Amino acid sequence: LTAKYPNFAAQTVDADAPLSIELIGAIDKVQQVAGVPTSVPIAMTTYAEAKDLLRELVTRNLAQNMSIRYAGWMNGGMNQQLLSSVRLIRQLGTQEELFSFAQNAAIAGVPLYLDGLTAFARDSGLLEGFIAFRDAARFTTREEAEIPEYSPIWYGANDDRDTYYLVKPAIAMRSVNTLVDAAASYGAGVSFRDIGYM
């Protein structure tokens, strides 16, 4: 092959190639708290670790055409609760640390996108703000739009996982505005993980 096409195997460096990094802040894990199974956020990438990673990429000159998407940074982690307000995860750090990370990204010229779910919600109960009977969108048959988790391996409904709900459009728009306002307060952009996903 190389005899017929001598330039085929030549290595080229494309400095303009985009690099997109997704960081996961916290995941949810059910643990026993005082004998009661409770969903607890487990830190994967804290705000300070994200800032250190950004600093290292910048010092190694790898931050050109780079963007960062930070998922699981608030409201319980990756399986986020309804986005009626933004509550940072204390296991990830303080508000000042998140602001410092966002500020360092802006100084380095690296777009930072704070990720959130706005069109879907998990049945979280009265205290978290989502009640399926009241807040879930409905099919034409008046059934709640309850959606099962799908396996990325065999593309079928995964009965071992909890279901989630499509929320009413008014609630989805409120969630969008909440996420946009929160991201703007840190000087970051937004990433809508679920808009357009079905």
What role is predicted for each listed range?
Residues 1-19:
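Core subunits and conserved enzymes of cellular information-processing
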Residues 3-5, 61, 186:
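Residues at helix C-cap/C′ positions in short coil/turn segments immediately following an alpha-helix
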Residues 14-171:
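Aromatic-lined carbohydrate-binding/catalytic grooves of carbohydrate-active enzymes
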Residues 157-198:
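Active-site neighborhood of glycoside hydrolase catalytic domains
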